[in-house]
Design a protein with these regions (language model features):
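Glycine-rich phosphate/pyrophosphate-binding loops
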Residues: 1, 141-146, 220
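Alpha-helix capping and helix-loop boundary segments enriched in small/acidic/polar residues
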Residues: 2-6, 33-36, 72, 120-124, ...
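Short amphipathic, charge-patterned alpha-helical segments
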Residues: 125-142
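Ferredoxin-type iron-sulfur electron-transfer modules in oxidoreductases and energy-metabolism complexes
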Residues: 13-26, 166-252
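Hydrophobic alpha-helical positions that pack around
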Residues: 10-125, 137
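Buried hydrophobic positions in well-ordered alpha/beta secondary-structure cores of metabolic enzymes
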Residues: 40, 132-133, 213, 251
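Active-site loop ensemble at the mouth of alpha/beta enzyme cores that anchors a bound cofactor
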Residues: 48-60, 161-179
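Small-residue-enriched alpha-helical segments and adjacent helix-cap loops
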Residues: 3-38, 146-164, 171
Length: 252
């Protein structure tokens, strides 16, 4: 992503070192993207890599069948590649001994917001937000834990009373319409307005909508107009718009 130029320099430097050390006769290409949020979706990312506008593709065919340049494509998150190294070095049994029964292993959680020591926390899969707050030194002085985003901008918002829910895919988190996604945890306090947080998130999605699907393109703007009225939200209309956006947009 173009927002992180220093990381691109670092990656290219390390690739040269690895190829020289291991004498690898393979090509590793680092493609620079414009930073569109939608390119986190695998087919949109492939479109961007091909030099086209980052728009999600209709499925089927799936990228495993017809991906980059119409070839079957394996798309991995960098975190998957990171943990593969540990599994190879230390064994699968040791790795799976961490975490919960349904979600073994470890994860890297990016914790930001109203904590004393924000940053990346390596913790067992299925850790709770209360546990992560403790690993970050607790809440900032003068701040009381009020709510949190369990999975970045699109993962939903949960109150502090749900702070003991395991943060991983499916399970209890999904029952509340939330997901852990990128494991980007944002901690909110009693000093934050949740209405302002919701408005800020929707403004982000309006800006980052690729515009390909009308329900998303128009729906984000409509939702913003509704929640700007902080005194009273039309919850029924919000739910209707959200359902249409989810059902009638390619990303879902």
């Amino acid at each position: 992503r173009d927002e992180y130029p220093e990381i691109r320099i670092f990656i290219n430097r390390e690739i040269k070192k690895v190829k020289l050390f291991l004498k690898l006769d393979i090509n590793i290409h680092v493609r620079r993207g414009a930073g569109a949020y939608i390119c986190g979706e695998e087919s949109a990312m492939i479109e961007s890599i091909e030099g086209k506008r980052g728009l999600p593709r209709h499925r089927p065919p799936y990228v495993a069948q017809k991906g980059i340049f119409n070839k079957p494509t394996l798309v991995n998150n960098i975190e998957t590649l990171y943990w593969i190294r540990e599994i190879i070095e230390k064994g699968g049994k040791k790795f799976s001994s961490k975490g919960t029964k349904n979600h073994p292993g470890a994860r890297s959680y990016s914790v930001s917001g109203r904590v004393k020591n924000p940053g990346v926390v390596f913790a067992p899969a299925g850790s709770t937000v209360n546990e992560l707050i403790l690993k970050c030194g607790g809440m900032l002085d003068g701040h009381k834990f009020k709510a949190y985003l369990p999975g970045g901008a699109s993962g939903g918002i949960l109150p502090s009373t749900k702070g003991d829910i395991p943060l991983d895919f499916g399970g209890e988190l999904a029952k509340y319409g939330c997901f852990v996604g990128s494991h980007a945890i944002v901690i909110l306090s009693d000093k934050d307005s949740l209405a302002d947080v919701a408005l800020n998130l929707m403004a982000f999605f309006k800006h980052e909508s690729c515009g390909q699907c009308t329900p998303c393109r128009n729906g984000t703007e409509k939702i913003i107009n509704i929640i700007k009225n902080k005194s009273k939200w039309d919850k029924e209309l919000l739910c209707d718009i959200s359902e249409v956006m989810a059902n009638a947009s390619i990303c879902g």
